[in-house]
């Protein structure tokens, strides 16, 4: 009989072997996007400007978008809020921060597994040079950092918005109350797009054309890995909040959608996520 560790090791080895067999069979049949070579951006022009100039101007547009998002962040942070509401929102943020730290460790463990597959596929099966493989590995980390950083920013600004929205709702004015979460969503959206585009434009502008393909492949893998892991675990995290809300109904003997239960929104969100 195998021990628990031996069974887990054997199962992982079987998974790796299956993946390698699949990759070895697919490698001769398909070309890789990592082999794409970008043209010289200075050789084409639009409206009297070279392609390089237009993309370089795009970086400034993206940076302006990032500044726009940070301005909304500062506005939300400086809004008035009751001390009790602020205390609750900060407690929620500390809980979310613990979740993000744990999730970051999990993503890095998952990345080690994915990176080993990338090394085997691109280095052994596709016969890429060492520098190309290292570029793919490096930019996969850049992609993960982009997803993870924006996720952290989103949780931080949403906990700001929660307490400020609750305090503004005491005045009974719908539009000013509605504008607060709307600003939070705009801030996250503009910052997300701006950060991702700045990285992609930097690859187009400052990385040699023959190395841009590996950079984009690594960046896409990292972004997808980070976003998928955060989304799946985030759904589980939301479901935990849903269960916590249901438990509070039992403890305090309140109905399903009782306004006295502050976990009603978490309950509704968790039900939809489930």
Where in this protein do the model-derived segments appear?
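N-terminal secretory/membrane targeting signals
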Residues: 1-31
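Hydrophobic, small-residue-rich transmembrane alpha-helices and their short perimembrane loops
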Residues: 30-274
């Amino acid at each position: 009989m195998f021990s628990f560790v031996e069974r887990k090791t054997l199962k992982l080895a079987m998974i790796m072997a299956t993946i390698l067999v699949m990759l070895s069979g697919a490698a001769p049949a398909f070309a890789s996007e990592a082999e794409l070579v970008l043209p010289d951006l200075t050789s084409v022009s639009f409206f009297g400007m070279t392609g390089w100039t237009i993309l370089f101007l795009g970086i400034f547009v993206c940076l302006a978008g990032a500044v726009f998002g940070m301005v909304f962040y500062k506005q939300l942070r400086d809004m008035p809020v009751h001390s009790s509401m602020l205390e609750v929102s900060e407690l929620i943020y500390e809980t979310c921060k613990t979740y993000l730290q744990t999730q970051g460790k999990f993503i890095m463990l998952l990345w080690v597994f994915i990176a080993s597959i990338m090394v085997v596929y691109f280095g052994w099966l596709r016969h890429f040079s060492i520098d190309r493989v290292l570029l793919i590995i490096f930019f996969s980390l850049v992609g993960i950092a982009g997803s993870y950083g924006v996720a952290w920013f989103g949780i931080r600004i949403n906990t700001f918005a929660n307490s400020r929205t609750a305090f503004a709702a005491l005045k009974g004015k719908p539009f000013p109350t509605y504008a607060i979460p709307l600003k939070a969503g705009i801030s996250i959206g503009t910052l997300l797009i701006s950060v991702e585009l700045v990285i992609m434009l930097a690859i187009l502008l400052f990385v040699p054309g023959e190395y841009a393909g590996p950079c984009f492949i690594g960046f896409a893998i990292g972004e997808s890995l980070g976003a998928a892991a955060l989304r799946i675990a985030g759904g589980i995290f939301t479901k935990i909040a849903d269960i916590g809300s249901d438990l509070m109904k039992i403890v305090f003997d309140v109905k399903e959608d009782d306004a006295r239960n502050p976990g009603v929104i978490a309950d509704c969100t968790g039900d939809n996520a489930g």
